[in-house]
A protein has these predicted regions:
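Catalytic-core region of carbohydrate-active enzymes that cleave or remodel glycosidic bonds
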Residues: 406-463
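Aromatic-lined carbohydrate-binding surfaces of glycoside hydrolases
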Residues: 157, 168-175, 180-381, 389-398
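Mature N-terminal, pre-catalytic/accessory segment of carbohydrate-active enzymes
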Residues: 17-254, 353
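Aromatic- and acid-rich polysaccharide-binding/catalytic face
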Residues: 385-411
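Short, glycine/acidic-rich beta->alpha junctions
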Residues: 72, 227-228, 277-281, 366-367, ...
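Positively charged n-region of N-terminal signal peptides that target proteins for export
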Residues: 1-4
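Bacterial N-terminal signal peptides
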Residues: 7-16
Length: 463
Protein backbone atom coordinates (compact mmCIF):
# COMPACT_ATOMS: atom_id res chain seq x y z
CA UNK A 1 0.00 0.00 0.00
CA UNK A 2 1.31 3.39 -0.99
CA UNK A 3 1.24 5.56 2.09
CA UNK A 4 0.64 5.33 5.80
CA UNK A 5 -2.92 6.54 6.44
CA UNK A 6 -3.29 9.80 8.26
CA UNK A 7 -4.53 8.12 11.46
CA UNK A 8 -0.94 7.20 12.30
CA UNK A 9 0.06 10.82 12.66
CA UNK A 10 -0.17 12.46 16.03
CA UNK A 11 -1.25 15.71 14.43
CA UNK A 12 -4.28 14.03 12.94
CA UNK A 13 -5.26 11.78 15.80
CA UNK A 14 -6.72 14.74 17.64
CA UNK A 15 -10.27 13.44 17.62
CA UNK A 16 -13.58 15.24 17.62
CA UNK A 17 -14.31 17.25 20.73
CA UNK A 18 -17.83 15.86 20.55
CA UNK A 19 -16.54 12.51 21.80
CA UNK A 20 -15.96 12.85 25.52
CA UNK A 21 -15.85 9.14 26.35
CA UNK A 22 -12.29 7.88 26.02
CA UNK A 23 -11.00 4.35 26.12
CA UNK A 24 -8.81 3.58 29.15
CA UNK A 25 -5.10 3.44 28.44
CA UNK A 26 -3.31 0.11 28.53
CA UNK A 27 -0.86 -0.87 31.25
CA UNK A 28 2.77 -0.06 30.57
CA UNK A 29 4.56 -3.37 29.79
CA UNK A 30 7.95 -1.75 30.41
CA UNK A 31 7.53 0.73 33.28
CA UNK A 32 11.22 0.79 34.20
CA UNK A 33 12.67 1.16 37.67
CA UNK A 34 10.12 2.70 40.03
CA UNK A 35 12.85 3.84 42.43
CA UNK A 36 13.17 6.95 40.28
CA UNK A 37 9.98 8.22 41.93
CA UNK A 38 11.33 7.96 45.48
CA UNK A 39 12.87 11.43 45.36
CA UNK A 40 9.75 13.03 43.82
CA UNK A 41 7.78 14.46 46.73
CA UNK A 42 5.16 16.54 44.92
CA UNK A 43 3.68 17.18 41.50
CA UNK A 44 5.79 19.24 39.12
CA UNK A 45 5.27 20.98 35.79
CA UNK A 46 7.94 21.86 33.23
CA UNK A 47 8.33 22.66 29.56
CA UNK A 48 9.46 19.62 27.64
CA UNK A 49 10.61 19.13 24.06
CA UNK A 50 8.32 18.35 21.13
CA UNK A 51 11.06 16.00 19.91
CA UNK A 52 10.84 13.72 22.97
CA UNK A 53 8.28 10.96 23.65
CA UNK A 54 8.07 11.00 27.45
CA UNK A 55 7.54 7.76 29.37
CA UNK A 56 4.28 7.61 31.27
CA UNK A 57 5.92 5.56 34.02
CA UNK A 58 8.94 7.76 34.71
CA UNK A 59 9.22 11.30 36.12
CA UNK A 60 10.01 13.91 33.48
CA UNK A 61 12.40 16.82 33.67
CA UNK A 62 12.37 20.02 31.67
CA UNK A 63 12.73 23.79 31.67
CA UNK A 64 10.81 26.52 33.48
CA UNK A 65 10.91 28.92 30.52
CA UNK A 66 10.18 28.52 26.81
CA UNK A 67 10.89 30.76 23.81
CA UNK A 68 9.31 29.80 20.49
CA UNK A 69 9.99 31.35 17.07
CA UNK A 70 7.38 31.72 14.34
CA UNK A 71 6.55 33.46 11.10
CA UNK A 72 3.26 35.29 10.82
CA UNK A 73 0.72 32.73 9.64
CA UNK A 74 2.74 29.79 10.99
CA UNK A 75 1.65 27.08 13.42
CA UNK A 76 4.06 26.17 16.21
CA UNK A 77 3.77 23.56 18.93
CA UNK A 78 4.89 23.28 22.53
CA UNK A 79 4.82 20.42 25.02
CA UNK A 80 4.69 20.62 28.81
CA UNK A 81 5.05 17.62 31.12
CA UNK A 82 3.23 17.07 34.40
CA UNK A 83 4.72 14.44 36.74
CA UNK A 84 3.05 13.45 40.00
CA UNK A 85 3.88 11.02 42.84
CA UNK A 86 0.23 11.06 44.02
CA UNK A 87 -3.17 10.59 42.42
CA UNK A 88 -4.67 13.74 40.90
CA UNK A 89 -8.44 13.37 40.59
CA UNK A 90 -8.97 16.37 38.30
CA UNK A 91 -6.42 18.09 36.10
CA UNK A 92 -7.34 20.97 33.78
CA UNK A 93 -5.20 23.54 31.98
CA UNK A 94 -5.55 26.91 30.29
CA UNK A 95 -3.38 29.27 28.26
CA UNK A 96 -3.69 33.03 28.53
CA UNK A 97 -3.74 35.47 25.64
CA UNK A 98 -0.25 36.12 24.29
CA UNK A 99 0.55 39.84 24.47
CA UNK A 100 3.06 42.05 22.69
CA UNK A 101 2.30 45.52 24.00
CA UNK A 102 -1.18 46.27 22.68
CA UNK A 103 -0.96 43.44 20.12
CA UNK A 104 -2.64 40.18 21.15
CA UNK A 105 -2.67 36.60 19.93
CA UNK A 106 -5.90 35.46 21.62
CA UNK A 107 -6.07 32.23 23.59
CA UNK A 108 -8.74 31.07 21.12
CA UNK A 109 -5.92 30.56 18.57
CA UNK A 110 -4.18 28.06 20.85
CA UNK A 111 -5.50 24.50 20.73
CA UNK A 112 -4.91 22.46 23.88
CA UNK A 113 -4.59 18.69 24.15
CA UNK A 114 -3.81 16.09 26.76
CA UNK A 115 -1.46 13.57 25.16
CA UNK A 116 -2.70 9.99 25.56
CA UNK A 117 -0.59 6.85 25.38
CA UNK A 118 -0.99 4.05 22.83
CA UNK A 119 0.61 0.65 22.42
CA UNK A 120 3.09 0.23 19.59
CA UNK A 121 5.96 -2.02 18.53
CA UNK A 122 8.92 -1.85 16.20
CA UNK A 123 8.31 -4.89 14.03
CA UNK A 124 6.09 -7.94 14.27
CA UNK A 125 7.94 -10.84 15.90
CA UNK A 126 11.12 -8.76 16.21
CA UNK A 127 10.50 -6.84 19.44
CA UNK A 128 7.99 -6.57 22.26
CA UNK A 129 5.27 -3.93 22.48
CA UNK A 130 5.75 -0.71 24.37
CA UNK A 131 3.77 2.39 25.32
CA UNK A 132 4.21 5.78 23.60
CA UNK A 133 2.44 9.16 23.79
CA UNK A 134 0.75 9.74 20.43
CA UNK A 135 -2.95 10.61 20.68
CA UNK A 136 -3.73 14.32 21.00
CA UNK A 137 -6.94 14.29 23.01
CA UNK A 138 -9.25 17.35 23.21
CA UNK A 139 -10.81 16.35 26.53
CA UNK A 140 -11.06 19.24 28.96
CA UNK A 141 -10.01 17.41 32.12
CA UNK A 142 -8.22 14.23 33.10
CA UNK A 143 -7.42 12.07 36.10
CA UNK A 144 -3.67 11.53 36.47
CA UNK A 145 -2.56 8.50 38.46
CA UNK A 146 0.20 8.44 41.04
CA UNK A 147 3.73 7.93 39.76
CA UNK A 148 2.89 8.87 36.18
CA UNK A 149 3.76 11.63 33.73
CA UNK A 150 1.18 13.31 31.50
CA UNK A 151 2.27 15.47 28.54
CA UNK A 152 0.22 18.54 27.58
CA UNK A 153 0.32 19.77 23.98
CA UNK A 154 -0.20 23.29 22.65
CA UNK A 155 -0.88 24.12 18.99
CA UNK A 156 -0.40 27.87 18.48
CA UNK A 157 -1.76 29.40 15.27
CA UNK A 158 -0.13 32.76 14.66
CA UNK A 159 -2.37 35.16 12.69
CA UNK A 160 -1.01 36.34 9.35
CA UNK A 161 -1.50 39.93 10.43
CA UNK A 162 0.22 39.51 13.81
CA UNK A 163 2.49 42.39 14.75
CA UNK A 164 6.16 41.26 14.75
CA UNK A 165 7.77 41.11 18.17
CA UNK A 166 7.84 39.06 21.37
CA UNK A 167 4.52 37.84 22.76
CA UNK A 168 4.26 36.62 26.33
CA UNK A 169 1.65 34.57 28.16
CA UNK A 170 1.15 31.89 30.77
CA UNK A 171 0.27 28.20 30.87
CA UNK A 172 -1.74 27.36 33.99
CA UNK A 173 -2.37 23.76 35.08
CA UNK A 174 -4.86 23.15 37.90
CA UNK A 175 -4.38 19.93 39.87
CA UNK A 176 -7.14 19.31 42.44
CA UNK A 177 -7.27 23.02 43.17
CA UNK A 178 -3.51 23.66 43.15
CA UNK A 179 -2.29 25.86 40.30
CA UNK A 180 1.03 25.41 38.51
CA UNK A 181 2.15 28.09 36.05
CA UNK A 182 4.80 28.36 33.36
CA UNK A 183 5.72 31.47 31.34
CA UNK A 184 5.54 31.24 27.56
CA UNK A 185 7.28 33.56 25.07
CA UNK A 186 6.75 33.62 21.31
CA UNK A 187 9.02 35.59 18.96
CA UNK A 188 7.13 36.49 15.76
CA UNK A 189 9.24 37.70 12.83
CA UNK A 190 8.11 39.88 9.93
CA UNK A 191 7.94 37.09 7.33
CA UNK A 192 4.48 35.83 6.37
CA UNK A 193 3.54 32.21 5.63
CA UNK A 194 0.65 31.92 3.14
CA UNK A 195 -2.55 30.07 3.95
CA UNK A 196 -2.19 26.25 3.66
CA UNK A 197 -4.43 26.26 0.59
CA UNK A 198 -1.78 28.36 -1.18
CA UNK A 199 1.20 26.15 -0.33
CA UNK A 200 2.89 24.58 -3.34
CA UNK A 201 4.03 21.47 -1.42
CA UNK A 202 2.02 18.52 -2.77
CA UNK A 203 1.01 16.68 0.41
CA UNK A 204 -0.92 13.44 -0.13
CA UNK A 205 -1.79 11.65 3.11
CA UNK A 206 -4.38 8.99 2.46
CA UNK A 207 -7.69 9.27 4.31
CA UNK A 208 -9.76 6.35 5.59
CA UNK A 209 -13.32 7.52 6.43
CA UNK A 210 -14.29 3.94 7.29
CA UNK A 211 -11.94 4.01 10.29
CA UNK A 212 -13.71 7.07 11.69
CA UNK A 213 -17.13 5.40 11.47
CA UNK A 214 -15.83 2.31 13.24
CA UNK A 215 -14.02 4.25 15.97
CA UNK A 216 -17.05 6.37 16.86
CA UNK A 217 -19.53 3.55 16.23
CA UNK A 218 -21.73 5.58 13.90
CA UNK A 219 -23.40 4.57 10.61
CA UNK A 220 -21.34 5.09 7.49
CA UNK A 221 -22.07 8.39 5.73
CA UNK A 222 -24.56 9.48 8.38
CA UNK A 223 -24.65 13.04 9.69
CA UNK A 224 -22.86 11.83 12.82
CA UNK A 225 -20.12 10.29 10.65
CA UNK A 226 -19.49 13.55 8.80
CA UNK A 227 -19.67 15.55 12.04
CA UNK A 228 -16.89 13.40 13.54
CA UNK A 229 -14.78 13.62 10.39
CA UNK A 230 -15.05 17.39 9.98
CA UNK A 231 -12.55 18.51 12.67
CA UNK A 232 -10.13 15.76 11.62
CA UNK A 233 -10.20 16.68 7.94
CA UNK A 234 -9.90 20.39 8.72
CA UNK A 235 -6.73 19.58 10.65
CA UNK A 236 -5.53 17.73 7.56
CA UNK A 237 -6.36 20.72 5.36
CA UNK A 238 -4.45 22.96 7.76
CA UNK A 239 -1.42 20.70 7.28
CA UNK A 240 -1.50 21.51 3.55
CA UNK A 241 -3.22 18.38 2.23
CA UNK A 242 -3.96 18.57 -1.49
CA UNK A 243 -5.53 15.20 -2.38
CA UNK A 244 -8.86 13.47 -1.67
CA UNK A 245 -8.55 9.67 -1.34
CA UNK A 246 -11.45 7.79 -2.98
CA UNK A 247 -11.97 4.04 -3.24
CA UNK A 248 -13.93 3.25 -6.39
CA UNK A 249 -13.88 -0.55 -5.99
CA UNK A 250 -14.38 -2.80 -2.98
CA UNK A 251 -11.20 -3.46 -0.98
CA UNK A 252 -8.64 -2.08 -3.45
CA UNK A 253 -5.75 -3.31 -1.27
CA UNK A 254 -7.28 -6.68 -0.43
CA UNK A 255 -8.38 -5.58 3.06
CA UNK A 256 -4.84 -5.13 4.35
CA UNK A 257 -5.93 -2.29 6.65
CA UNK A 258 -7.76 -2.85 9.95
CA UNK A 259 -10.70 -0.90 8.51
CA UNK A 260 -11.10 -2.03 4.88
CA UNK A 261 -11.85 0.52 2.18
CA UNK A 262 -15.25 -0.04 0.57
CA UNK A 263 -16.38 1.13 -2.85
CA UNK A 264 -17.81 4.64 -2.92
CA UNK A 265 -19.50 3.89 -6.24
CA UNK A 266 -22.22 1.25 -6.58
CA UNK A 267 -22.20 -0.69 -9.85
CA UNK A 268 -25.43 -2.36 -10.96
CA UNK A 269 -25.89 -4.65 -13.94
CA UNK A 270 -29.43 -4.32 -15.26
CA UNK A 271 -31.63 -7.20 -16.41
CA UNK A 272 -31.04 -6.20 -20.05
CA UNK A 273 -27.26 -6.32 -19.54
CA UNK A 274 -26.71 -2.56 -19.41
CA UNK A 275 -25.02 -0.83 -16.47
CA UNK A 276 -26.08 1.82 -13.98
CA UNK A 277 -23.84 3.52 -11.43
CA UNK A 278 -24.72 5.25 -8.18
CA UNK A 279 -22.26 8.03 -7.31
CA UNK A 280 -24.11 9.28 -4.22
CA UNK A 281 -21.45 8.35 -1.64
CA UNK A 282 -18.59 9.41 -3.90
CA UNK A 283 -20.19 12.81 -4.50
CA UNK A 284 -20.93 13.42 -0.82
CA UNK A 285 -17.40 12.45 0.24
CA UNK A 286 -15.66 14.59 -2.40
CA UNK A 287 -17.85 17.63 -1.75
CA UNK A 288 -17.37 17.24 2.01
CA UNK A 289 -13.59 17.17 1.63
CA UNK A 290 -13.68 20.20 -0.65
CA UNK A 291 -15.76 22.05 1.92
CA UNK A 292 -13.06 21.19 4.49
CA UNK A 293 -10.47 22.88 2.25
CA UNK A 294 -8.96 19.90 0.38
CA UNK A 295 -9.74 20.39 -3.29
CA UNK A 296 -6.69 20.24 -5.56
CA UNK A 297 -6.80 16.58 -6.65
CA UNK A 298 -9.13 13.57 -6.45
CA UNK A 299 -7.32 10.20 -6.51
CA UNK A 300 -9.53 7.21 -7.33
CA UNK A 301 -8.25 3.77 -6.34
CA UNK A 302 -7.98 1.54 -8.26
CA UNK A 303 -8.37 -0.32 -11.54
CA UNK A 304 -5.62 -2.80 -10.68
CA UNK A 305 -6.44 -4.13 -7.19
CA UNK A 306 -4.10 -6.41 -5.35
CA UNK A 307 -6.50 -9.35 -5.52
CA UNK A 308 -7.90 -8.67 -9.04
CA UNK A 309 -11.43 -9.11 -7.68
CA UNK A 310 -14.31 -6.79 -8.63
CA UNK A 311 -17.92 -6.87 -7.49
CA UNK A 312 -21.23 -5.52 -8.74
CA UNK A 313 -24.92 -5.92 -8.00
CA UNK A 314 -26.73 -8.19 -10.45
CA UNK A 315 -30.36 -7.08 -10.79
CA UNK A 316 -31.32 -10.29 -12.58
CA UNK A 317 -30.54 -12.40 -9.51
CA UNK A 318 -30.86 -9.74 -6.79
CA UNK A 319 -27.39 -10.63 -5.56
CA UNK A 320 -23.84 -9.33 -5.44
CA UNK A 321 -21.53 -10.98 -7.94
CA UNK A 322 -17.75 -11.06 -7.91
CA UNK A 323 -15.48 -11.32 -10.93
CA UNK A 324 -11.81 -12.22 -10.78
CA UNK A 325 -10.06 -10.84 -13.84
CA UNK A 326 -6.89 -9.03 -14.87
CA UNK A 327 -6.54 -6.01 -17.17
CA UNK A 328 -5.47 -8.09 -20.16
CA UNK A 329 -8.61 -10.26 -20.07
CA UNK A 330 -11.89 -9.77 -21.95
CA UNK A 331 -13.92 -9.94 -18.73
CA UNK A 332 -11.99 -6.96 -17.39
CA UNK A 333 -12.74 -4.91 -20.48
CA UNK A 334 -16.45 -5.77 -20.35
CA UNK A 335 -16.63 -4.71 -16.71
CA UNK A 336 -14.36 -1.65 -16.59
CA UNK A 337 -14.75 0.14 -19.94
CA UNK A 338 -18.47 1.03 -19.52
CA UNK A 339 -17.75 2.27 -16.01
CA UNK A 340 -14.85 4.48 -17.10
CA UNK A 341 -16.95 6.09 -19.82
CA UNK A 342 -19.85 6.76 -17.46
CA UNK A 343 -17.50 7.97 -14.70
CA UNK A 344 -15.87 10.46 -17.06
CA UNK A 345 -19.26 11.87 -18.02
CA UNK A 346 -20.26 12.16 -14.36
CA UNK A 347 -17.02 13.91 -13.39
CA UNK A 348 -17.40 16.38 -16.24
CA UNK A 349 -20.97 17.14 -15.19
CA UNK A 350 -19.73 17.86 -11.65
CA UNK A 351 -16.82 19.97 -12.90
CA UNK A 352 -14.29 17.59 -11.32
CA UNK A 353 -12.82 15.81 -14.32
CA UNK A 354 -9.65 17.87 -14.73
CA UNK A 355 -8.67 17.42 -11.08
CA UNK A 356 -9.38 13.67 -10.97
CA UNK A 357 -6.75 10.94 -11.35
CA UNK A 358 -7.31 7.24 -11.85
CA UNK A 359 -4.83 5.98 -9.27
CA UNK A 360 -2.85 2.74 -9.22
CA UNK A 361 -0.06 1.53 -6.98
CA UNK A 362 2.68 -1.08 -6.83
CA UNK A 363 1.35 -3.50 -9.44
CA UNK A 364 3.15 -5.39 -12.22
CA UNK A 365 4.03 -3.07 -15.07
CA UNK A 366 2.30 -5.11 -17.76
CA UNK A 367 -0.96 -4.95 -15.79
CA UNK A 368 -0.61 -1.21 -15.27
CA UNK A 369 0.02 -0.66 -18.98
CA UNK A 370 -3.02 -2.73 -19.98
CA UNK A 371 -5.24 -0.83 -17.55
CA UNK A 372 -3.83 2.51 -18.72
CA UNK A 373 -4.57 1.65 -22.34
CA UNK A 374 -8.20 0.98 -21.40
CA UNK A 375 -8.42 4.24 -19.46
CA UNK A 376 -7.22 6.20 -22.50
CA UNK A 377 -9.69 4.34 -24.71
CA UNK A 378 -12.54 5.38 -22.40
CA UNK A 379 -11.45 9.03 -22.47
CA UNK A 380 -8.11 10.24 -23.77
CA UNK A 381 -8.15 13.18 -21.31
CA UNK A 382 -8.18 11.01 -18.18
CA UNK A 383 -5.24 11.60 -15.85
CA UNK A 384 -3.43 8.81 -14.06
CA UNK A 385 -1.62 8.80 -10.72
CA UNK A 386 0.77 6.05 -9.76
CA UNK A 387 2.69 4.98 -6.69
CA UNK A 388 5.53 3.16 -8.38
CA UNK A 389 7.96 0.76 -6.80
CA UNK A 390 10.05 1.15 -9.96
CA UNK A 391 13.00 3.37 -10.69
CA UNK A 392 12.52 6.28 -13.06
CA UNK A 393 13.57 5.09 -16.50
CA UNK A 394 12.29 1.54 -15.99
CA UNK A 395 9.30 2.24 -18.20
CA UNK A 396 7.92 4.92 -20.48
CA UNK A 397 4.54 4.65 -18.75
CA UNK A 398 5.85 6.69 -15.82
CA UNK A 399 6.53 9.63 -18.12
CA UNK A 400 2.85 9.72 -19.12
CA UNK A 401 1.54 9.90 -15.55
CA UNK A 402 0.18 13.21 -14.33
CA UNK A 403 1.30 12.40 -10.79
CA UNK A 404 3.97 9.83 -9.96
CA UNK A 405 5.09 8.93 -6.47
CA UNK A 406 8.32 6.98 -6.16
CA UNK A 407 9.28 4.73 -3.26
CA UNK A 408 11.55 6.53 -0.78
CA UNK A 409 14.43 4.15 -1.49
CA UNK A 410 14.38 5.16 -5.18
CA UNK A 411 13.84 8.88 -4.58
CA UNK A 412 17.13 10.07 -6.07
CA UNK A 413 15.72 11.33 -9.36
CA UNK A 414 17.62 13.72 -11.66
CA UNK A 415 16.44 17.24 -10.96
CA UNK A 416 16.23 18.05 -14.66
CA UNK A 417 13.79 15.14 -15.08
CA UNK A 418 11.50 16.55 -12.38
CA UNK A 419 11.84 20.06 -13.79
CA UNK A 420 10.78 18.81 -17.21
CA UNK A 421 7.72 17.11 -15.72
CA UNK A 422 6.87 20.21 -13.72
CA UNK A 423 7.02 22.31 -16.90
CA UNK A 424 4.31 20.03 -18.33
CA UNK A 425 2.12 20.49 -15.23
CA UNK A 426 2.98 17.05 -13.86
CA UNK A 427 3.73 16.15 -10.23
CA UNK A 428 6.66 14.09 -8.95
CA UNK A 429 6.71 12.98 -5.31
CA UNK A 430 8.09 10.17 -3.16
CA UNK A 431 6.26 8.03 -0.63
CA UNK A 432 6.73 5.95 2.48
CA UNK A 433 4.70 2.86 3.31
CA UNK A 434 5.78 -0.04 5.53
CA UNK A 435 9.27 1.02 4.53
CA UNK A 436 11.68 2.49 5.31
CA UNK A 437 12.06 1.82 9.02
CA UNK A 438 13.08 5.47 9.29
CA UNK A 439 12.34 8.15 8.42
CA UNK A 440 8.63 7.39 8.55
CA UNK A 441 5.36 8.23 10.29
CA UNK A 442 4.71 5.13 12.38
CA UNK A 443 3.42 5.59 15.92
CA UNK A 444 6.93 4.64 17.11
CA UNK A 445 8.69 7.08 14.75
CA UNK A 446 10.55 9.99 16.28
CA UNK A 447 8.48 13.18 15.80
CA UNK A 448 11.30 14.86 13.86
CA UNK A 449 11.09 12.19 11.14
CA UNK A 450 7.86 13.68 9.74
CA UNK A 451 9.48 17.10 9.53
CA UNK A 452 12.56 15.60 7.89
CA UNK A 453 10.49 14.04 5.10
CA UNK A 454 9.32 17.48 4.00
CA UNK A 455 12.82 18.95 4.08
CA UNK A 456 14.14 15.91 2.22
CA UNK A 457 11.54 16.35 -0.54
CA UNK A 458 12.46 20.03 -0.90
CA UNK A 459 16.20 19.32 -0.98
CA UNK A 460 15.85 16.72 -3.74
CA UNK A 461 13.55 18.95 -5.81
CA UNK A 462 10.31 16.96 -5.50
CA UNK A 463 6.89 18.57 -5.61
Amino acid sequence: MKKISLWALALLTALSAQAQTFEPELADPKPGAQETWNSVKKASLAWGSTDIRYSRSQPATGQKTLLLDAWRGERVSAQAVLSTPVDLARVTFEVSDLRNGKAIIPASRINKYFVRYVMTDWHENKSDSFLLPDHLSPETEMKVEARTTRPLWLDIRVPQDAKPGTYKGTLTVNCDGQAFTLPLSLQVCSRVLPEPSEWAFHLDLWQNPYAVARYFNVPLWSKAHFDHMRPIMKLLADAGEKVITCSIIQHPWNSQTYDPFESMIAKMKQIDGSWKYDYTVFDRWVQFMMDCGIDKQIDCYTLVPWHYVFDYYDCATNSTKTVKCEPKQAEYRELILPFLKDFAAHLKAKGWFTRTCIAMDERPMDQLQAAWDLVKEADSQYRIEGAMNYKVGDTGLIDEMHDISILYYDAHVPREYMDARRAKGQKTTFYTCCAPDRPNTFTFSDPAESAFLGWHAYTLGFD
